[in-house]
Amino acid sequence: MAAPNLASTPAPEFRGRIYDSILDTVGATPLVRIKRLQAEYGVKADILAKLEFFNPLSSVKDRIGLAMIEALEADGTIGPDTVLVEPTSGNTGIALAFVAAAKGYKLILTMPESMSIERRKMLKLLGADIRLTPAANGMKGAIAAAEEILAEIPGSVMPQQFKNAANPAVHRRTTAEEIWLDTDGGADILISGVGTGGTLTGVGEVLKLSLIHISEPTILR
């Protein structure tokens, strides 16, 4: 059987690139029409899903993990020997672990012992040092433990996802711009889950500046 002539097969636009780092593959996630949902409910508008699981570690948090660490690098807060410390129970920890591994930083994560074995294994595979706290203490216990570690290790730094301005900023700079460009400025409604609020804040601010008809709903049903 003759080998296929791959050279004659049209390649998707995203092929033919070789990246210098896995970090360069964060973002630029696709928008996809959810046609079956539109048909099922008789919706005339396009329903689009932004596939953030196309990020390297399958989460929108990859954006903020990279953004927070690079912001700390840019302002000189961290250097090659800096130890990063963060309390986390979610995908931000995985994102920070992935970025820290790619850049060579030591990362200590504190989290309640109730977190799944799968999550712990993933973090360990990425090289993170995991410190478990009593489940009964919840995230407050993890935060307290992280603060104790910061006090013990000179020069250690906490990215602080809930307070870090790089969180919403990266969504203004990337996520919002991607949505705007991919829809030719035609986005009318944005629906987003809320954790730290970074995605909704960053994207919402940009769309509200660009589209005067966009506003927060006054009634939630």
Place the predicted regions along the sequence by residue.
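PLP-dependent amino-acid enzyme catalytic core
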Residues: 1-216, 221
